[in-house]
């Protein structure tokens, strides 16, 4: 086991704080509409230019081990805020730095760190209660666009794209972000339920231009096993042919004689059919088949449900207005399922989301809700170069998360103003003793810091602006984009309540831990062998020419 070095008390804390400051100073230059870019070196490929706080934080590793511990703790603040709210990472970093900086002064003066932390926690709880009071729900598409624009560093086109996507697929819909292939941003919306399985034979294609198979007003047969014997399918095929409508078969697989017969009947125009594999695997496949059954008003023909292919009737088949089957995707548009059954299914999946333990499971369940309740929108980010697209894509991701947070918990005035109003509301808060009062003061001072940093990045005098904003009430604040004072909600400078709340909670949590730290244990630096010693350059033995 490698030897460890241990550092105690003030020396440990001061070096941890140095690490906090190095990371925070690199991250906080990105805050606000006039924040600066940071260039990140890559070990391969071209450098990345970003204004995304968490992207900057994740790149930072310091050579001094103790400083690096401090930096990693603040990196944790940014990462946790990003995971929970998707935005607000720079605000969280700025708040953490301010709490650590102010707290360090009190600890050095001999105050009890544990009481300081209790005071900090008390002030943060009160601040969050006040935040909830001034929060208001997002109701309009315009407000959603404004939140997205602020999060995307003032780029209105991104805000409009995201608002349009939410309009099209609903608040439950899935919105994904991809690299585009043109200079402009594009929005693609898939209405209905889409899954990632295509036709099993290209002979099913009936739209040669688009290379897809289109079925109008089809029946949908859902089966959880392989189909290889055509005799199993004949009874239901005859019933569908009599009805004079096309048929989509979704099964574990369709192969051999069964697939060949379907293709021949399709080519001859006897019965228009398309066969596709069922999406997913294992239990997830069963769940997805059940989703499609509920959406189309059919049943999954399976041994578990007591149904068999040979005895299947039209009553057990699903129906839809239109189905498009491509090489890799199948889209079911306007399924004939009962809306009450669909709502009940969505409710059931939402319960599973709340109980899910892994992010992967939660994401897949959320996708299923979206496909049943709304649709899928894809924002394709355009740009002239790969670097530009990557930087813009980061901002679109931030904006998307911010809008989801705004829909979830509402909005507050942006530009650091909400925290100033919170500070005014809790300024009379008292702790159980003088040391706890000092902890409350630390938070009160830290609440000013995001506004101070936004103003500093805009090239103005922070103290003057903070004093003027503090004199105002409600939504009155400083718009760093225009350099003017006014009602920030009216001028569209908004922050999601969830983002501000999460940033404050995470910052105070990690900063409080740092202040109560009294020792660090880390790997001791390795001694490098001196020249001429064994293992070093010039070691004994025959010389080699290089």
UniProtKB/Swiss-Prot annotation:
It catalyses: ATP + H2O + a folded polypeptide = ADP + phosphate + an unfolded polypeptide. It comes from the Bacteria. Its EC number is 5.6.1.7. The keyword ATP-binding applies. GO terms for molecular function: ATP binding; ATP-dependent protein folding chaperone; isomerase activity; unfolded protein binding. Belongs to the chaperonin (HSP60) family. Together with its co-chaperonin GroES, plays an essential role in assisting protein folding. The GroEL-GroES system forms a nano-cage that allows encapsulation of the non-native substrate proteins and provides a physical environment optimized to promote and accelerate protein folding. This is Chaperonin GroEL 4. The gene is groEL4.
